[in-house]
Amino acid sequence: MPIAYKNINQLWAYVFTETLKRLGLAYAVICPGSRSTPLAVAFAQQAPDIEGISILDERSAAFFALGLAKATNRPVAIVCTSGTAGANFYPAVIEAQESRVPLLLLTADRPPELRDCHSGQTIDQVKLFGSYPNWQTELALPVSDMGMLGYLRQTVIHSWYRMQAPTPGPVHLNIPFRDPLAPIPDGADLSYLLTKFHPEEFFAGITDTTSLPDHSQLSIPPEWLKSQRGIIIAGVAQPQQPQEYCRAIARLSQTLQWPVLAEGLSPIRNYADLNPYLISTYDLILRNQQLATRLAPDMVIQIGDMPTSKELRTWIDTHQPRRWVIDPSDQNLDPLHGRTTHLRIRVEELGCKGVEEDKSSVSEYLQLWCNAETKVRVNVDETLDKMEDLVECKAAWLLSQILPPETPLFIANSMPVRDVEFFWKPNNLRVRSHFNRGANGIDGTLSTALGIAHRHQSSVLITGDLALLHDTNGFLIRNKFVGHLTIILINNNGGGIFEMLPIAKFEPPFEEFFGTPQDIDFAQLCTTYNVQHELIHSWVHLQQRLNPLPNTGIRVLELRTNRKIDAQWRRDNLSNFAADNII
């Protein structure tokens, strides 16, 4: 249906959103405000091609958009008014940059004549997010000129490209508007401009040309083939095609006959049948110092970001092997500053052929790793299987075995990601793990999880109480949310991760400034937001609630644990799983 343009702001916003629609934008998160009126109206008129999602709190909205972009592997736009509204995007902008997620940040602004003169709700929004965007600019003010409409169209197209290449990340457009902001006449005559503006001709040829670089297959470096003591580290990763990613690593592993040390946040552990040399208990194995010395490699291939494990990092730093990092981004992924070469490709682009498994050809070094994995895995499984008390580390181990196939799972920062690394059991459930490990903060946990779950398969979030409390405004999204999210709340009334640090021995000030108990009744909190709540009393009870998952709504399954008991359990057990494993 043709739109009757009442003013230049309306036409400008139409060109802006129509260009995005033709590029393939599917979601726009809209925060309420006056200065952004032209954009909000234009996005609303693009329904159903672009779904406009209204979210009150800008910080929550930005993390919701981040989750949507993670789940879809596509850019998501987020709109706010002028003033401090955009500043609330900042934590999500940082995470988007650090975890390489495409976000289009649209901050409406007052015109130049209303800046630096104490006009209301006006701050300096140019380069508001510092160096974090892939690209940023301020658009020109809307004017009645065909050349400027072409400038607007091409700037949007360029923004779309810069969000996705060469490395995905956020782009910030600061967009000034003069009054009137609503679609009402402004006294200007647009008739002459509109006689020259023919949408089908103007927008012809707009397509999403962003694609992965067309690399030819890269042969395996000869020195890899010569090494008999090499390991592959499959780090933190959220690949668009997880099965192909896992197959590529399996081919490399079988070609080289090297073990794959797979982080719990890597899809490798959820496609375990693809890789016969998968090592999931490396953090526990390396706590045995004698065994760790025998396992020291002379070469390491790191795929993607480094795993969370401090034990692994310390071990590599101590032995200083020759290292290669495989990742298509332009980022430095070596926080250890070792003898490292970066290959700026995807692991799928390595030209290696898998070989049939031949047990007689397995090297002594590879066999040492596989034997250690088998023994430690048995110790872990037997210990956790017999555990009846609600000790939080068992949650990750149990989830790895009982979630419905291909469930999207968001893993909160702090202790949940560590328990996943320690205890996530290799499986073939194809669970789609998501996380915010760019900057590793707890902010935006609930909102990101809701973004991941929106219009997707029923999803699960595992989080501690502080991470959830830090983002309770995310519950305000409930009326806009389409889908289901189950929140597994590990409520230990405080910051359990700090119990593992040396400061835990100092009381005071530990409990007041690090433990930080909030003493929240989560049943009452959920009632406030009209969210379902259930207190879990046993592991069997939890298992009954997780398979199958509901189709709609948000619910909280609360497990009350004791963080001091949990911390003592880790101190007593983590180093013991491989204590007698001298092979």
UniProtKB/Swiss-Prot annotation:
<dbReference type="GO" id="GO:0042372">
    <property type="term" value="P:phylloquinone biosynthetic process"/>
</dbReference>
<comment type="pathway">
    <text>Cofactor biosynthesis; phylloquinone biosynthesis.</text>
</comment>
<dbReference type="GO" id="GO:0009234">
    <property type="term" value="P:menaquinone biosynthetic process"/>
</dbReference>
<dbReference type="GO" id="GO:0030976">
    <property type="term" value="F:thiamine pyrophosphate binding"/>
</dbReference>
<protein>
    <recommendedName>
        <fullName>2-succinyl-5-enolpyruvyl-6-hydroxy-3-cyclohexene-1-carboxylate synthase</fullName>
        <ecNumber>2.2.1.9</ecNumber>
    </recommendedName>
</protein>
<dbReference type="InterPro" id="IPR012001">
    <property type="entry name" value="Thiamin_PyroP_enz_TPP-bd_dom"/>
</dbReference>
<dbReference type="GO" id="GO:0000287">
    <property type="term" value="F:magnesium ion binding"/>
</dbReference>
<dbReference type="GO" id="GO:0070204">
    <property type="term" value="F:2-succinyl-5-enolpyruvyl-6-hydroxy-3-cyclohexene-1-carboxylic-acid synthase activity"/>
</dbReference>
<comment type="subunit">
    <text>Homodimer.</text>
</comment>
<comment type="pathway">
    <text>Quinol/quinone metabolism; 1,4-dihydroxy-2-naphthoate biosynthesis; 1,4-dihydroxy-2-naphthoate from chorismate: step 2/7.</text>
</comment>
<keyword id="KW-0460">Magnesium</keyword>
<keyword id="KW-0786">Thiamine pyrophosphate</keyword>
<keyword id="KW-0808">Transferase</keyword>
<comment type="function">
    <text>Catalyzes the thiamine diphosphate-dependent decarboxylation of 2-oxoglutarate and the subsequent addition of the resulting succinic semialdehyde-thiamine pyrophosphate anion to isochorismate to yield 2-succinyl-5-enolpyruvyl-6-hydroxy-3-cyclohexene-1-carboxylate (SEPHCHC).</text>
</comment>
<dbReference type="GO" id="GO:0030145">
    <property type="term" value="F:manganese ion binding"/>
</dbReference>
<dbReference type="InterPro" id="IPR004433">
    <property type="entry name" value="MenaQ_synth_MenD"/>
</dbReference>
<dbReference type="InterPro" id="IPR032264">
    <property type="entry name" value="MenD_middle"/>
</dbReference>
<dbReference type="Pfam" id="PF02776">
    <property type="entry name" value="TPP_enzyme_N"/>
</dbReference>
<keyword id="KW-0479">Metal-binding</keyword>
<dbReference type="Pfam" id="PF16582">
    <property type="entry name" value="TPP_enzyme_M_2"/>
</dbReference>
<dbReference type="InterPro" id="IPR029061">
    <property type="entry name" value="THDP-binding"/>
</dbReference>
<comment type="similarity">
    <text>Belongs to the TPP enzyme family. MenD subfamily.</text>
</comment>
<keyword id="KW-0464">Manganese</keyword>
